[in-house]
Regions:
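Non-catalytic cap/lid and distal C-terminal segments of serine-dependent acyl enzymes
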Residues: 32-356
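Bacterial N-terminal signal peptides
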Residues: 8-20
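Positively charged n-region of N-terminal signal peptides that target proteins for export
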Residues: 1-5
Length: 356
């Protein structure tokens, strides 16, 4: 099998794994590798309390997400239509995709229990001027690669001057329990891995120059990848100011010394107890997301965790947009297909666009 075909297989598997397997049901999955870094697994859940259900019952009544909506809480669904920006258009410049592999055996941070090859796919817009630092998106699980989804969106929205001329770095996760180690660990380790190992290789392999300006850097992911996106910006705010998350795993999935309740620390302690950081966030959760009927006290209800995080962001005065998806599941593809262009436009609001 040649490397390009292998790249496509790996990318499709990664996207299917997150957008399909994890979307199947409301029961919380076992933490890959166990909670607390490998010392446990799924714990039995308690049913949601009347108070929990009353909080969740408010979400379907949120105002509909309209074009150009600002900060706040919104809803979409129950019916969905793919955004026209996903379709490839004729008569506009089309960017290119460059793919390469990184061997885990050469990594100082994530060598893997078993060596593996990590696919890295890079979108470079046709309008990119060599040598000029480009703003960029860093996405988990190769999000946006399948069917050139993100490439088409960026082609169209850059041409329409709705987004700046930007690159996208779509990186596959490590296999098996490696994914949870990388994404669910609440620490700066993964962000530093990206900065010191992935991004230098991207510049070397593609010739693109990536901006160092945190205003020009966005992280993007779903499920554990959504938690990773926020973790990168939280711990390395000097590098990232923009975050986009679908069904973010802001729950007690992988505990650590600095986060005894895993990513649930974000709504529970990190955001409430710290000064406001210059982070702009778009976040989503679905009606039938993981743990939607479990007790908030278990810290394993994705709906309540995201709802509470949104509440804290509002109280602290963050620029954020929280979207509740009716008739949808975990990292539901129909939600992404409808909302991603508008989410990108919100996250990149106020960033300079040439010619606008």
């Amino acid at each position: 099998m040649n490397r390009r075909l292998l790249a496509s297989v790996i990318a499709c598997f990664a996207i299917a794994s997150v957008g399909g397997i994890l979307a199947q049901g409301p029961a919380a999955p076992a933490a890959p590798g166990g909670r607390g870094g490998g010392k446990g697994g799924q714990r039995p859940g308690n049913p949601a309390t009347p108070e929990d259900l009353a909080d969740i019952a408010k979400l379907p009544n949120l105002p509909a997400l309209g074009q150009g909506a600002g900060d706040g809480d919104f809803s979409v669904g129950p019916d969905y239509t793919p955004a026209p920006e996903e379709k490839q258009r004729v008569g506009i410049p089309h960017g290119k995709l460059i793919e390469f592999f990184m061997s885990s055996s050469s990594s100082k941070v994530f060598p893997g229990d078993t060596p593996f090859e990590r696919l890295v796919s890079v979108y470079i817009p046709a309008q990119y001027v060599p040598g000029r630092p480009a703003p960029f998106i860093f996405s988990a699980d190769s999000y946006g690669l399948q069917g050139r989804q993100l490439a088409n969106i960026l082609d169209n929205m850059i041409a329409d001057r709705r987004l700046p001329v930007m690159a996208a770095v779509m990186t596959a996760n490590g296999p098996g329990p490696e994914r949870s180690l990388e994404y669910d660990t609440v620490s700066p380790v993964f962000a530093d891995f990206v900065e010191n190992e992935i991004l230098p290789r991207v510049e070397k392999e593609t010739g693109v120059t990536l901006t160092k300006d945190p205003e020009g850097r966005m992280t993007y992911g779903g499920s554990s990848g959504g938690a990773m996106a926020l973790t990168m910006a939280w711990y390395r705010t000097e590098r990232y100011h923009r975050v986009l998350s679908y069904s973010g795993t802001f729950v007690d999935l992988r505990e650590g010394p600095g986060a005894p309740h895993g990513a649930y620390e974000y709504p529970e302690h990190f955001f409430p107890d710290n000064p406001v950081k210059p982070i702009r966030i778009w976040m989503h959760v679905s009606e039938n997301d993981i743990g939607a009927t479990s007790a908030s006290a278990d810290r394993r209800n994705w709906v309540i965790a995201n709802q509470r995080l949104a509440g804290v962001l509002k109280a602290k005065g963050y620029h954020y947009q929280f979207v509740y998806a009716k008739n949808a599941g975990h990292v539901d593809s129909k939600v992404i297909h409808q909302t991603l262009p508008q989410a990108l436009e919100y996250v990149w609001k106020d960033y300079p666009i040439s010619g606008k």
